[in-house]
Structures are given as C-alpha cells and as structure tokens.
C-alpha cells in the first residue's frame, strides 16, 4: 500500500515564509513532518511556524540567507543539534531582482540571481546530502520553473538559473541514487505569489504564460503541494 505520510520525517523548506514555500511547509506539517521553515527574515518564518503549531503541527522557524554559505552552515549545525537528521530538503528560495532584456542586467543583479538560485540551491543540497548519505535515505526536492526549459521574455537570466537547477537535480540524482538519496525537481508554470506579482499584473506577460499552458490559467501555491508531498514521501521510493 502506498504511504504518502510524512510522519516522523524532518523537513527543511527554504523560502518558507510565503508563496509556494509556505504552502509546502504547512502541507508537510499536516502530513506529519516536523518542518524547519527557512527564509531570510526571522519574523516571517516565526509566523509560519506558529501557524503550523496552532494547527497541531510541529515546526521551527530559522532565519537563513541561502545565498550565504556561513548562514547555511549555521542552519545545518542547528538542525543536526536539535534533530540529528534531515529527511527532506525543499530548495524553494529564489531571487529575481531584474525584469528586462539580458543585455541590460547589471553585474550586481546577475550575481544576486545566481547567488540564491544556483549557489544557494547547491550548498543547501550539498549539506543535506552529506547527512542523508550517513542515514542511507533522504529526498531533495528542487523547485525549478518552466522558465528553465525556455527562458521567457524579461526573465532571461532567471530562466538560465532555473536551467542550472534542472541540470543540478539530474547531477545529484545520478550521484546519490545509489546510496538511497533521491533528488527531483518540480518545474511550475506561473504561480500567483508575491514573487510573481509583476507578471500577474501585466496583461501581456499573463497572456504569454497562460496561452502556453494547457489549462489556460496560472496556478495557486497549494496546487504545487501535491507533487512535493509525493516526492517527500516513501510512496516515491523509486522516483
């Protein structure tokens, strides 16, 4: 019988203070996981953690800038001290400081986008993988984007970072699968979040995305949750 429960699993969700990350964190807790909610600001992660606990779940909010290696090391040291293991990592934190043609992006904006979306994903996965290898099990879930398959207008550099996330997912899947650690990615289309607000509010950009989506509309954060629960659960043991 398939087991979609996350009972007794320790899960880290980055970018967990809003949008897709918040929806996944709360859904994981509903399925029985203890969730470490991560984002840059302590107030945001505390709010989500408190809402999870008020609903009967288990959660801890830890502020962490995933683009900074020192902050990631502090995060994992605390997770190891308090829980001794990590069963699931959801790499969801993202940055997109620039909308416009790639030829006009500044070096600072380019660096920030890659720092969070590529380096941050890699370092978070690397630290999780080291713990999971010792355990002999674990699931790493990277939130990519359809932009990683075909960079959209005004978001070319962001799309390149998501292409890197897709390639990174394949790399870790090949390296870690033999030791019981799974790595997958979810590549959503346009999702209604604060992060994507500028796209939702632009009739031209909204049309660009929805016209290329078979369902003809954008998604809500809770519509991404089911895939994440599956990939985090033992039901996905061969995925």
How does the language model describe each region?
Residues 31-48:
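Conserved glycine-rich Rossmann-like NAD(P)H-binding loop of the short-chain dehydrogenase/reductase
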């Amino acid at each position: 019988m398939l087991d979609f429960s996350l009972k007794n699993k320790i899960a880290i969700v980055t970018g967990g203070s809003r949008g897709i990350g918040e929806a996944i964190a709360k859904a994981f807790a509903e399925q029985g996981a203890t969730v470490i909610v991560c984002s840059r600001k302590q107030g945001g992660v505390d709010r989500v953690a408190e809402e999870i606990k008020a609903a009967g779940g288990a959660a801890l909010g830890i502020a962490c800038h995933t683009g900074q290696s020192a902050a990631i090391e502090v995060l994992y040291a605390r997770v190891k001290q308090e829980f001794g293991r990590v069963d699931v990592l959801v790499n969801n934190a993202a940055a997109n400081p620039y909308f416009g043609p790639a030829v006009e992006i500044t070096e600072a904006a380019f660096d920030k986008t890659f720092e969070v979306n590529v380096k941050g994903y890699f370092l978070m996965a690397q630290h999780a993988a080291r713990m999971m290898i010792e355990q002999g099990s674990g699931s790493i879930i990277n939130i990519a984007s359809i932009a990683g398959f075909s960079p959209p207008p005004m978001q070319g550099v962001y799309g390149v970072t998501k292409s890197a996330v897709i390639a990174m997912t394949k790399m870790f899947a090949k390296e870690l699968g033999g030791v019981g650690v799974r790595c997958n990615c979810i590549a959503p289309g346009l999702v209604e979040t604060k992060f994507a607000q500028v796209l939702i509010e632009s009739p031209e950009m909204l049309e660009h995305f929805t016209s290329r989506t078979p369902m003809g509309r954008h998604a809500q954060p809770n519509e991404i949750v089911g895939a994440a629960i599956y990939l985090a659960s033992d039901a996905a043991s061969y995925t």
